[in-house]
């Protein structure tokens, strides 16, 4: 099978694209320094780990609240099942008694069982109320996480503001005419500085551009 070959024109076009990207990157770096925005962006970037920690805190608090609520439901369920079962059994016995009155001894036993059921109900309901209160108290995480989320929104807005400043200050004059915005371009890549080949500082960016001849 014949391998596709790259025409000289294609090689020339690719070289032009790389050269333009390098030149634009260098221009952007120099403009950032002149405008003092490089430090502002660095400060915004430092806020990202803080936002990540806050997100983790929100996840933890939400998980803890969910676990507390589920534990309370599981603890209350047997008490509710027992009351339901006893109430249905007593109702059936009383219906049978009204349909066919039983002996006095059996009637006394039915009355005794009914009184015992009524005596047990407050204990079951008190336990259930305590679990319901626990479920309600578990929702207090919303106040804390609400503050955290608000702080995170402030961080995101600051990063957005800094990035928009960079874009507005570095748009070439010939390209400043109104045009349809491509919102997808606002989504920047995620950078993992622990990976090989990923630059992690401004000096490394400058060295990379110098090595490429820009």
Swiss-Prot record:
It is found in: Cytoplasm. It comes from the Bacteria. The keyword Hydrolase applies. Plays an important role in bacterial chemotaxis signal transduction pathway by accelerating the dephosphorylation of phosphorylated CheY (CheY-P). InterPro entries: Chemotax_Pase_CheZ (IPR007439), CheZ_family_phosphatases (IPR050992). GO terms for molecular function: phosphoprotein phosphatase activity. This is Protein phosphatase CheZ. Homodimer. Keywords: Chemotaxis, Cytoplasm, Flagellar rotation, Hydrolase, Protein phosphatase. The lineage of its organism: Bacteria, Pseudomonadati, Pseudomonadota, Gammaproteobacteria, Enterobacterales. The keyword Hydrolase applies. It holds the Pfam family CheZ. Belongs to the CheZ family. GO terms for cellular component: bacterial-type flagellum; cytoplasm. Its EC number is 3.1.3.-.
């Amino acid at each position: 099978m014949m391998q596709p070959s790259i025409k000289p024109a294609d090689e020339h076009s690719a070289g032009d694209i790389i050269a333009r990207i390098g030149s634009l990157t260098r221009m952007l770096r120099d403009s950032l320094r002149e405008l003092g925005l490089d430090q502002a962006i660095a400060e915004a970037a430092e806020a990202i780990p803080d936002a990540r920690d806050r997100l983790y805190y929100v996840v933890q608090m939400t998980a803890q609240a969910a676990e507390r609520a589920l534990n309370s439901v599981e603890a209350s369920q047997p008490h509710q099942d027992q009351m339901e079962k006893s109430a249905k059994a007593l109702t059936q016995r009383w219906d049978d008694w009204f349909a066919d009155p039983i002996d006095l001894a059996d009637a006394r036993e039915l009355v005794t069982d009914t009184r015992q059921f009524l005596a047990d109900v407050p204990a079951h309901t008190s336990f259930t109320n305590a679990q319901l209160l626990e479920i309600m108290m578990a929702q207090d995480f919303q106040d804390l996480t609400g503050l955290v989320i608000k702080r995170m929104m402030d961080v995101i807005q600051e990063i957005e503001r800094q990035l928009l400043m960079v874009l507005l200050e570095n748009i070439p004059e010939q390209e400043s005419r109104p045009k349809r915005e491509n919102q997808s371009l606002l989504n920047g890549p995620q950078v993992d500085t622990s990976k090989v080949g990923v630059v992690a500082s401004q000096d490394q960016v400058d060295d990379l551009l110098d090595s490429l001849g820009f």
